[in-house]
């Protein structure tokens, strides 16, 4: 019999319920998602996260209040942990903020604490995997996505952005966004996006999403459409305002009102659709299969080489003693 042939059972067996069994287990366990925000203060990082998940997950500094900045002149890691429930689906979310990034006169190597943190999470996961009696479900603290905030200044990438993106895109799924994009006109926004896309190509950054041979034509087309929008021009708001009898999430300015859910005013809806509704699971899987696997392979090779070196040294020592 052809091993690939399809056979219809003569009567009902019941293995079609496996999807229900998987769903039940996943609903019971919940999903883990770890998202990091990187960018200078005053770009609306906290507000955007809270707007994306329609929940107050992290506090934000008011404006550019210097007192809200870290005392030490280094990038810090501030982690907020929450559980969100929507229609029986439980999402365990860690939001990793990086206060201090790019906020000082000397920002050289501001990315190093971020890179160190990401690698440490991979290392912790690997250690738990290699223990003799490992946990059935290893707590996953690996960073699944990084929202990287760019200044809405219409200029080329800064040296800090270039150096940070070069390193972060090698070890994590980076999604660039233009913070507080309502400070730009629509034409300025379009020109700025094209400029930044050219910069990404110039520096050969591996911006998420990635294509692979496993993707269908429909999925490849979706990725192409997403890449045409990156960096997302975003505006966030936790407040509801009313204009002409219509209530929406947004904020009022001196001249007009910004509706964050209006695709003609910003890309918030597109970012939410991409990040949460179409690519959330892929972000988690890509972190595991690409970024973590690469780290794991390098670590295991290094361990093997160290073991071989010690073995060779031991054999040489015995030979000398003889």
Swiss-Prot record:
> Per the annotation, which location comes first and is thus the protein's main one?
membrane
Give residue numbers for the modification (N-acetylmethionine).
1
User: Which keywords label this protein?
Assistant: Acetylation, Cell cycle, Cell division, GTP-binding, Membrane, Nucleotide-binding, Phosphoprotein
* Cellular component, GO, one term: cellular bud neck
Topological category with respect to the lipid bilayer: Peripheral membrane protein
Domain of life (superkingdom): Eukaryota
Domain Septin-type G residues, every copy? 29-302
User: Which SUPFAM superfamilies does this one have?
Assistant: P-loop containing nucleoside triphosphate hydrolases
Instruction: Give the binding site residues for GTP.
Output: 39-46, 74, 100, 180-188, 236, 251
Q: Which residues form a coiled coil?
A: none
PTM sites of type Phosphothreonine: 216
Tell me the segments the record calls region G3 motif.
Answer: 97-100
Task: Give the span(s) annotated as G4 motif.
Answer: 179-182
Q: Name one GO molecular function term.
A: phosphatidylinositol-5-phosphate binding
Cellular localization per UniProt: Membrane; Bud neck
Summarize the protein's role. Septins are GTPases involved in cytokinesis that assemble early in the cell cycle as a patch at the incipient bud site and form a ring approximate 15 minutes before bud emergence, which transforms into an hour-glass shaped collar of cortical filaments that spans both sides of the mother-bud neck. This collar persists until just before cytokinesis, when it splits into two rings that occupy opposite sides of the neck. The septins at the bud neck serve as a structural scaffold that recruits different components involved in diverse processes at specific stages during the cell cycle.
Q: How does it assemble?
A: Component of the septin complex which consists of CDC3, CDC10, CDC11, CDC12 and probably SHS1 and rearranges to a cortical collar of highly ordered filaments at the mother-bud-neck. A complex formed by CDC3, CDC10, CDC11 and CDC12 is capable of forming long filaments in vitro and the components seem to be present in a 2:2:2:2 arrangement in vivo. The filaments are proposed to be formed by the end-to-end polymerization of CDC3-CDC12-CDC11 complexes with CDC10 serving as a bridge to bundle the polymers into paired filaments.
According to its UniProt record, which protein family does this protein belong to?
Answer: Belongs to the TRAFAC class TrmE-Era-EngA-EngB-Septin-like GTPase superfamily. Septin GTPase family.
Something else the entry says is: Present with 14100 molecules/cell in log phase SD medium.
* The protein, known as: Cell division control protein 10
């Amino acid at each position: 019999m052809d091993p690939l042939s399809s056979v219809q059972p003569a009567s009902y067996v019941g293995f079609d319920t496996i999807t229900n069994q998987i769903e039940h287990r996943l609903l019971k366990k919940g999903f883990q998602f770890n998202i990091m925000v990187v960018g200078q203060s005053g770009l609306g990082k906290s507000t955007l996260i809270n707007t994306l998940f329609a929940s107050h997950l992290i506090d934000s500094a008011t404006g550019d209040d210097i007192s809200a900045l870290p005392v030490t002149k280094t990038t810090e890691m501030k982690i907020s942990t929450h559980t969100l429930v929507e229609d029986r689906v439980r999402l365990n979310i860690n939001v990793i903020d990086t206060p201090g990034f790019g906020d000082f006169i000397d920002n050289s190597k501001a990315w190093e604490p971020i890179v160190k943190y990401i690698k440490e999470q991979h290392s912790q996961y690997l250690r738990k995997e290699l223990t003799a009696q490992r946990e059935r479900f290893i707590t996953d603290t690996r960073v699944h996505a990084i929202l990287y905030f760019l200044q809405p200044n219409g200029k080329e990438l800064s040296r800090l952005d270039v150096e940070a993106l070069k390193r972060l895109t090698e070890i994590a799924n980076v999604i660039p966004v233009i913070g507080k994009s309502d400070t730009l006109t629509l034409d300025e926004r379009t020109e700025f996006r094209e400029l930044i896309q050219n910069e990404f190509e110039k520096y050969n950054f591996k911006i998420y999403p990635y294509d692979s041979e496993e993707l269908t034509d429909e999925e490849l087309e979706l990725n192409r459409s997403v890449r045409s929008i990156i960096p997302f021009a975003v505006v966030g708001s936790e407040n509801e305002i009313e204009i002409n009898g219509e209530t929406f999430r947004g904020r009022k300015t001196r001249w007009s009102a910004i509706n964050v859910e209006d695709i003609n005013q910003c890309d918030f809806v597109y970012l939410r659709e991409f990040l949460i509704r179409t690519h959330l699971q892929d972000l988690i899987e890509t972190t595991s299969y690409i970024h973590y696997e690469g780290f794991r392979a390098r670590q295991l090779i290094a361990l093997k080489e160290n073991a071989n070196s010690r073995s060779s040294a031991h054999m040489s020592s015995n030979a000398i003693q003889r």
